[in-house]
Amino acid sequence: NALRVMRDTQVNQAQNLANQNVPGFRRDLTDNTNTKFLDVMNGLQTRAFQMEGEGGAFAEQAGFMDRTGEELDVAIGDQGYFFIQPQNGEVALSRRGDLRRQPDGTLINGAGDTMLDAGLQPIVVPPYQSIRITELGEIHIEPQGGAPGETVVAGVLGTVVPEADVQLRKGLDGEIRQVDGGVPNPNQGAEVIQFTLEGSNVNPVEELLTSIEIQRNFEIGLRMVMSAKELDEGSATLMRPPE
């Protein structure tokens, strides 16, 4: 069991280090696994079996806020998430805010996921001279070719601050959703900050130090397993009747 937990931790750390420069990435955590003993009549057997955790746990603390000055860079100030439509998958939550406008006007993030509005519909922004995004996520533009000073609301970035009892997990596709695979309803409770990009919440120094510690523990555990095997084989030899 311990060796399996260490293996899973190493996999998560490799994933975290690979994504340390991805805006809004949430650090993967290793799930705690439980142990179940076999029930027998009037007692318990000493043999135990590992029970796998649900998987997909992640750290929710915010990453570093970088004031980029780019008009399509947005970040969530504290708690909350944007809504996205991944290229291959169901609606999900994200903290990634490096936005760009496609030729057809669709607003996407740096991963190519479509940004959704408060109705969970794709946001399409017409050509503009300037753009301003409010704390509520409202997208105000000066239309290209419009009258001087004319502004229109081109859309609203859908956001949510989930209730305390909502459990979020990363799915097999790496996207954040509720444990049942759905997403909470938009409530526009998050604070949106324009000209700012949130980095990942991965601490590379911490990950590397933990990786070294895990590797040492793995080697110790492996030596213990080999020693136990040798002792078992030695005991079997001693108990073998003479020929």
Give short role names for the model-derived ranges:
Residues 1-243:
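Amphipathic alpha-helical polymerization modules
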